[in-house]
Amino acid sequence: MLIPRRVKHRKQHHPGRSGAATGGTKVSFGEWGIQALSPAYVTNRQIESARIAMTRHIKRGGKVWINIYPDRPLTKKPAETRMGSGKGSPEWWVSNVKPGRVLFELSGVSEEVAREALRLAIHKLPLKARIVRREGGE
């Protein structure tokens, strides 16, 4: 599970989800990638679930890169608690994903295997996404 080892502040403001991604919009390490088409908070559990789905499908071949990291805490107040008395306790670690961001990359497998593995991973994520191929330099 991806969790920061230590953080300067235990609780943060919620990051804004509007606007498009400014960096990390191209496939840079692998041959294939998953590109976000909608904004979302992706939790560390969702990232791990997508990674497992991909690696199980490609079996021993290929290499997977994870380009996002859950570095923001999201807080939650306990059920049936009155409002007030401070901010809730950190519940999840999330990555703020904006449209255009490449989340995962994959290489070392055939096109059919890569497309199916990435399709399985997309189903584990809480956003709309598409499969993209590396541009040029093949």
Swiss-Prot record:
One of its GO terms (biological process) is translation. Residues 1-24 are annotated as: Disordered. InterPro entries: Ribosomal_uL16, Ribosomal_uL16_bact-type, Ribosomal_uL16_CS, Ribosomal_uL16_dom, Ribosomal_uL16_sf. SUPFAM superfamilies: Ribosomal protein L16p/L10e. Binds 23S rRNA and is also seen to make contacts with the A and possibly P site tRNAs. Gene3D superfamilies: Ribosomal protein L10e/L16. The keyword Transcription regulation does not apply. Residues 1-16 have a biased composition (Basic residues). Part of the 50S ribosomal subunit. It comes from Arthrobacter sp. (strain FB24). This is Large ribosomal subunit protein uL16. Keywords: Ribonucleoprotein, Ribosomal protein, RNA-binding, rRNA-binding, tRNA-binding. One of its GO terms (molecular function) is rRNA binding. The keyword RNA-binding applies. GO terms for cellular component: cytosolic large ribosomal subunit. Belongs to the universal ribosomal protein uL16 family. CDD domains: Ribosomal_L16_L10e.
